Amino acid sequence: MTTVIWDFGGVLLRWDPAALIARTLPHRITDELGPQHWKEQFFLSYRGEWGEYDRGVMTEAEMVPLIAKRTGLQVREVQAVVDAVPAELQPIEQSVALVRALRDRGHRLHYLSNMPAPLADRIEREQPFLQLFESGVFSSRVKISKPAPAIFTLAEQAFGCDPATTLFIDDHPENIEAALAHGWQARLFTGADAIAAELRQL
C-alpha cells in the first residue's frame, strides 16, 4: 500500500494567479505589463510577503499595504486580488476523481499544502473532498512552508508514513526536489491526465 501526499493549489484546487490578476485588475494589463508581470510582482514566487502569509507569520492586514508599497498598486487593488483568491481555489474535478479512486483502492491519503490560515480555514469548511484524506498539514498551522526540509520531516512524523512507500504530488519543481531529497518518491503535477496512468499502477 502506498501513501500518497497531495499538494492543493494547482493540483487539487485551481490556481492560476496570472489569470486571477488579469480578471481582477484588467485596467493594469498592458502590452508591456501583462498578467505574468503582475503575477511575478505580486507573489514574488511566494518568497515575499505572500510567502510569509503562507507560513502564518504575517497577517492579511499586514501583508496588503506592504505589497501595495512595493508594487505601486493601490491598497484597494491589492485587497481586491486577495479577496478574489477564494473563488479561484475551486476543485479540479479530474484531480479529485484520482484521489477518490486511490482511496477506494485502499491507499493512505494525506495533504501537504502551503496555505494562509484564512484560506485553510475556508477550505476545511467548504470543500467536501477533504473527507477523502486521513489528515493533512497546512503551512500556516505549523509556521513552516515547502520546500523547507523541516516541513517534510514534520509531515512524515504526523502521517506515520514510510518514505520508501510514500509518493508526493506537487506542481512546483522545488518542492519535488525537496521531497526527493527527503527520501520520498515524488512526481511533478502537470495535469490530471498526465499523472493518471502512473497512479493506476500503484
Predicted regions and their residues:
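Conserved phosphate-coupling serine/threonine residues in phosphotransfer and NTP-handling enzymes
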Residues: S113
